[in-house]
Amino acid sequence: MWKKLPSPGWLAFGTVVTVAGSGIAYDKYEQSQIRSLYVNHVRNEMSSSLSTNVKPRKLLVLVAPPPNDYLDTSLKLWRRWIKPILHSSGLDYEIVSGTKQGEIRTEIASRVRQLRKELIEQEQQQQHDAQSKKSRSWLDWFKWCRGVSTTPDPVSEESPAASFDTRSVLGIFYHNEPQPVVTEDSLLDPSVAGGVICVGRGAYKEYIAGVHEGILGPLEEPPKVVESDASSVTDTTASAVITENPSVKEISVTQPAETAVAAATVGTTMNETGAVNTDSTPAETIPAETTPTENTPIETTPDESSEEKEGPKISKPYILPSDYANASIPAELSKPLIIDPKTGAPAFFEQPLLVVAVPNLSGFTTIPTRIARFYQKRFLCEQVSHSTLAIVEAKSRPFTTTDLDLSAYEELDWPKSWVESGKERGSEWVQPLQGDDRVLQKFRVVEPAIVPSLQLKEDQSKKQELSPENK
């Protein structure tokens, strides 16, 4: 034991460390309690089992990093407070993340365009089947008049390869007949089927822009405007110089695959008949390095592996927000309810939408606010867990124009220098979010206020237990 108290410096140091550590430990403990409360509630409420041929309800999760930060910042919020609740509820999910601006918008727009193509093919197939059925009915009538049997023979029409099933040979369906696999979303009410979670204000902006681009934009990419100067420059290259070199002529005849590369390297131009245009430029003016030989390495285009390393391709918007009013809703999406032909569930943009803000401050002047938030993460945990419970229970309402400002307070944390530079280069995130009423009326948004807070209930029950009236 100490014979005397430590010095005032050590006492101050011990007090600061104890208070700081106690605050962190208390906040971590409260976070774990809140997470356990929601996880246990969801596990008990979603304890019903599904049939073996039914796939569970599936959510689409879009994750974008905060400005001037890494993607792991948003993924931490997802892994800590959203994923455990979805895992305990038994719901399936698909994550789409983007590290660059435009990746999520490009992915969402391509999915909407793919859905439109599938709907068009489905409608064409239905028309073709109806036409063939009509023509077949007349053919059967003529056969019936002649006394020919019109009943098809299933044994003769069905091929042995089509009727063979390995599972039947193994005896899997000996006691139970095979059943078609369906999704739970196709069996539920359209207002509670599926769901979309946008983690971050940036992901929400790209989701709205991507849906509008896919619905109001064209199916194919608009043609790019090519400047005429580029073609004139290539036509004026000194291509006739190579005509005096017999090696080039030999390559152009025997190796057509290398001719294009060699011609692009030295700047040769070919006419429609395959002959090389001639000029008065002497052959001695070309350096020896430009003449393609067997020892000269030929430049090739980057392979697919290098493209995969660069990341997904980000395409420019097929339609700008200023052109939304002039565009029309396509005929395949004009129905009140759009059903995905593959899953039988409503289209993902008609499913309930939840937006989760990712507060993230940076900079030296924001250190006091960052410290205060660090010791109060339990409140953010409660907010995110409560919102996740709302989408699990599918508590939603129709989308309104004011919902375009969901999680708009997150933009207050964005660095001002980043916002200013984004405005200069035309960044998508710093632009005001615009929407078309014809598209927005297809959306549904999750309303957490409909679901009572479990943490609030827990606090009220504890107060009632500690009140003097209950003692």
Swiss-Prot record:
One of its GO terms (cellular component) is mitochondrial inner membrane. One of its GO terms (biological process) is protein transport. Residues 272-317 are annotated as: Disordered. It is a single-pass membrane protein. Its main location: mitochondrion. InterPro entries: Lipid_Phosphate_FormReg, Mt_import_IM_translocase_Tim54. Residues 1-8 are mitochondrial matrix. It comes from the Eukaryota. Residues 26-471 are mitochondrial intermembrane. The chain crosses the membrane at residues 9-25. Residues 281-300 have a biased composition (Low complexity). Keywords: Membrane, Mitochondrion, Mitochondrion inner membrane, Protein transport, Translocation, Transmembrane, Transmembrane helix, Transport. It is found in: Mitochondrion inner membrane. Pfam families: Tim54 (PF11711). Essential component of the TIM22 complex, a complex that mediates the import and insertion of multi-pass transmembrane proteins into the mitochondrial inner membrane. The TIM22 complex forms a twin-pore translocase that uses the membrane potential as external driving force. Belongs to the TIM54 family. Component of the TIM22 complex, whose core is composed of TIM22 and TIM54, associated with the 70 kDa heterohexamer composed of TIM9 and TIM10 (or TIM8 and TIM13). This is Mitochondrial import inner membrane translocase subunit TIM54. It comes from Kluyveromyces lactis (strain ATCC 8585 / CBS 2359 / DSM 70799 / NBRC 1267 / NRRL Y-1140 / WM37) (Yeast).
